[in-house]
């Protein structure tokens, strides 16, 4: 998460927990988008006290930072506000303050232990169907430790909540662009034979206005490349900014995809063909096996 907020390389030392006053780095995301004229907001569906994320994000250029304590009259789980309730709050906030463009960074919280979300209250998610899928493809004796149908049910709930928010927001603000990613790899993946790709990678999904004008430039990237990608698609021509990353897309349809460019993450390095975790383990990236859906 630090890399997305400060633009610095990711390490296992949380910048937010440093003692003393933290400077606003030139590469900080909030600072850059504020410079571009955006109203910058950070939303976290858990407590703002977690890793001091409330004061941390405002110190890095976000105009406002919202935590669960700012989101009133919404259903809460052990970890924080229900994802769909938090997304509703954000949409309400956008409707109240639509007089200028906004940049909004959102960190949801429902997909965390103890997975105590009342999913049936909001979505008709069939837990038994998920249970059958697990039993068919990953019998208990061959399943990664602790993975249960309830965990995957909450995962599906979180996905549906985000999808609903994107749909509603895009209908109200059709010039919006959404960048969907994770702050860490998927810990609920049931396969016990976890390759480096599974245990270190995250997705990046780009959806919205004008996305069709761009094509993939590199096959491998990391968190540090996401903000440069957003800026490539939204900032005015010639805008200069500080970053350790590069845009992952290009508007030059004739440019070939670079499969050799190396992406550096906190736990691994990779290009379009290989991924290495620094511990002597090298994986060749291949197509995953097909699974039977129930």
Language-model features, listed with the residues they occupy:
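Solvent-exposed soluble domains appended to multi-pass membrane proteins
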Residues: 1-294
